[in-house]
């Protein structure tokens, strides 16, 4: 194992930790294992992360930043982008939304989580006829978030997934349209 890092140690540790997270889950991630995979000394992570929780918080913040970009790029197809993110990054998704981390303790995490949700609120605000964009965003998020968890937890066979996703996203659109006409 090398004690020298080339480039950005923090980024190298986050890459290694992200790989471990997706392979072994939250329980399988340690600072020591991230250091080993990043090929640095076992003490090197402490230059950037006070403890395992702060490493997990950084991974979650990074996940919310990626999710925000995906949602903003998706426009009206945010629901599909959200489900897609969950299915592509199941362990990171569980970390982000699992209640393990005290969001208020980590500024980067709080800001990046807020940005992801705000993208949905802004989409609802773009529909002037929606009387309460915050409530509409909360309702849409609840449906899509629940769908994501059901899919991750294996409650639907692989061959049923696509049709079920279409049905739920259609229900979200229908509910938004109903609120506009009410």
Label each region the model flagged:
Residues 69-92, 140:
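Hydrophobic alpha-helical connector segments
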Residues 12, 16, 20-54:
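Helix-turn-helix
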Residues 103-130, 134-139, 163-174:
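Amphipathic alpha-helical packing segments from all-alpha helical-bundle domains
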Residues 84, 88-126, 149, 153-158:
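Short secondary-structure transition hinges
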Residues 1-8, 180-182:
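N-terminal intrinsically disordered/low-complexity leader segments
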Residues 142-159, 174-181:
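Amphipathic C-terminal alpha-helical segment
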Residues 9-17, 34, 59-63, 67:
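Generic hydrophobic, amphipathic alpha-helix propensity
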Residues 61-78, 107-111, 120-122:
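Amphipathic alpha-helical linker/stalk segments
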């Amino acid at each position: 194992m090398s004690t020298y890092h080339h480039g950005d140690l923090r980024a190298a540790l986050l890459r290694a930790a992200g790989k471990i997270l997706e392979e072994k889950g939250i329980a399988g991630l340690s600072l020591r294992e991230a250091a080993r995979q990043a090929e640095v000394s076992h003490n090197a992570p402490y230059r950037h992360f006070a403890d395992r929780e702060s490493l997990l918080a950084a991974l979650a913040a990074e996940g919310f930043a990626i999710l925000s970009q995906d949602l903003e790029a998706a426009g009206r197809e945010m629901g599909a982008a959200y489900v897609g993110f969950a299915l592509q990054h199941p362990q990171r998704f569980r970390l982000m939304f699992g209640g393990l981390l005290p969001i208020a303790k980590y500024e980067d995490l709080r800001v990046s989580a807020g940005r992801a949700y705000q993208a949905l609120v802004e989409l609802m605000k773009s529909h002037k006829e929606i009387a309460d964009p915050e409530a509409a965003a909360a309702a849409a998020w609840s449906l899509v978030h629940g769908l994501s968890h059901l899919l991750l937890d294996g409650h639907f066979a692989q061959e049923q997934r696509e049709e079920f996703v279409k049905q739920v996203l259609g229900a979200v659109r229908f509910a938004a349209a109903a609120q506009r006409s009410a």
